[in-house]
């Protein structure tokens, strides 16, 4: 999928509009400042480094984040209509977490996390369209998201912290104690982490369906069969090198 300059800018403007509509002051102003400061980098960031993943193209990150925000609003309403206790969750909480859940994919405040790959073989055979910046110290995406927010002085609640940290659900083993607890007191105190995880999964799945699913099997057309039977010349050479009488008899009957 490719986006032109107008589409890239329109998507970024949409992202900013969610901040202005749903986030409360003073975080609204802090987030607008942060996202305007890093606009030139974020606007071209992919959501993934491999073609087989979701939105692995320039502009894919903002495209994905916008989709997660929209899906999170849908999920929030679904949980409300289903009777969930949402008394401690606001739209500010929902949009803040959806907006920043993957912020760590940006990299550090100074360096990008990924660059377009120049390795033709890896691009064509492995679908690795981007390579990771090894100058950066390793952090998981959620941890780097949280680090960038605190570095920018943007605060959050305990529920928001847990939500961003665990948004990958059980795809990340580090989240197992949060999602597989048999002690009632250790379960999520609000469904906010579940709302964001659900929204992220749904957005990523739909993007994958639209972008990659139609390509599966397209390059696997049947190849012409190669005749691998022995001609008389090859058979004679093979028989002369075989010492086992049984194997020689088997080859002679091919």
Language-model segments: residues:
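Histidine-centered, transition-metal-coordinating active-site segments
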Residues: 1-31, 52-54, 71-81, 192-254
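Acidic/His-rich, divalent-metal-binding segments that scaffold phosphate/diphosphate chemistry
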Residues: 1-125
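Divalent metal-dependent catalytic cores for phosphoryl transfer on phosphate-bearing substrates
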Residues: 55-57, 63, 75, 87-215
């Amino acid at each position: 999928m490719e986006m032109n300059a107008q589409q890239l800018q329109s998507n970024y403007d949409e992202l900013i509009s969610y901040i202005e509509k749903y986030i409360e002051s003073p975080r609204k102003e802090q987030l607008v400042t942060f996202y305007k400061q890093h606009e030139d980098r974020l606007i071209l960031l992919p959501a993934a480094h491999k073609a087989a993943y979701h939105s692995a193209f320039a502009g894919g990150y903002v495209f994905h984040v916008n989709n997660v925000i929209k899906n999170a609003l849908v999920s929030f309403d679904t949980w409300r209509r289903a009777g969930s206790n949402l008394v401690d969750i606001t739209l500010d909480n929902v949009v803040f977490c959806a907006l920043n859940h993957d912020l760590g994919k940006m990299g550090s405040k100074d360096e990008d996390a990924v660059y377009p790959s120049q390795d033709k073989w890896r691009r064509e055979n492995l679908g690795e369209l981007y390579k990771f910046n090894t100058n950066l110290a390793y952090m998981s995406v959620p941890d780097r998201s949280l680090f960038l927010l605190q570095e920018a002085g943007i605060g959050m609640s305990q529920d928001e912290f847990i939500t961003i940290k665990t948004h990958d659900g059980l795809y990340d083993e580090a989240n197992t104690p949060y999602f597989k607890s048999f002690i009632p007191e250790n379960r999520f105190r609000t469904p906010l982490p579940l709302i964001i995880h659900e929204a992220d999964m749904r957005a990523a799945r739909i993007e994958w369906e639209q972008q990659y699913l139609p390509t599966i099997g397209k390059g696997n057309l049947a190849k012409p069969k190669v005749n691998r039977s022995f001609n008389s010349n090859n058979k004679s050479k093979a028989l002369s090198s075989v010492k086992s009488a049984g194997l020689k008899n088997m080859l002679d009957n091919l």
